[in-house]
Amino acid sequence: MDKKHIIIDLEKCIGCFNCMLACTDEFVGNRWAPYSEKQILTGEKWIDTRRYERGKAPYTEVTFVTQTCRHCAKAACEKTFPQAIDRREDGVVLLDMKAAKGNKALVDACPYGMIKWNEELMTAQKCTMCAHLLDDGWEEPRCVQACPLRALSIVRCTDEEFTEMIDNLKLKPLEEGDNRPQVMYRNLYRLNSCFIKGAVVRKENDIIRAQEGVDVQLSLNDELIDYTKTDFFGEFKFDRLPKDSGVFKVTVKKDGFASVSKEVTVGEESQFMGELYIE
């Protein structure tokens, strides 16, 4: 049977929070038995978009990471409270409404913090992937439907097909572990890797001019690992570098000019090299 999976693309998300608003619109004040009790207006987010930064001034990049219930195939909450979990054949994981009532310990059973506590109704709650809508013929849950740039998408496929999709699209879970989440991420490098950024310029008659189309090479331990050309603004960037990956050498080459090299160390943070002058 086909299972339902959510894919979240970090390169596409701009932090508009439409997914959060759509979830609130669907569940606040609305009881969808036997799927879920109504959500309270404040203090509870079944889907949450958080802001992260890479780099430091004067060059930083912002990445928005949307998190929700992972609908894990091997869910930690299910291991702790098997009687409170309703695992559907399509892979959607629901909380049993009766078993969740008064069971605040369910909140701590999720290692990702995605089970919430409704203080008004004294019940544990979480994302249902809008199962009540999908069962009624909807193609997408509200969060996916509301995403203007398709940073969120739903996929219906077999486990084997999804495994192939993971390899082809280089999908990864947000956290390492053996819980086998049904929610996977694309372009996770925007969160957990570093970049090297800089610019190539030339001083002409006391005017500093950006140099477009200049070759820039990146080496590690005297081995060439990447290369690029500067853009219209004379800027270059090397990305997807592992944290604490060592001392890199950036070399700038342009016909008719002496090559310029500079070392830069990549630790926990991305690095901005500033301007490299060619003469």
Predicted feature locations:
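Exposed aromatic-hydrophobic patches
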Residues: L95-M97, E235-L241, G274-E275
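A short, solvent-exposed loop/turn motif at the edges and junctions
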Residues: V247-E263
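Extracellular beta-sheet/turn segments enriched in Thr/Pro/Gly and aliphatic residues
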Residues: R180-R186, K262-E279
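Short, acidic Ser/Thr/Gly-rich low-complexity loop/linker segments typical of extracellular
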Residues: N221-K237
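A structural signal for beta-strand boundary/capping segments at domain termini and interdomain linkers
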Residues: E78, A210, S259-S261
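Flanking helices and flexible, charged tails adjoining ferredoxin-like Fe-S electron-transfer domains
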Residues: R31-T68, K79, M97-N103, V107-I207
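Hydrophobic beta-strand segments
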Residues: E212-S219, V250
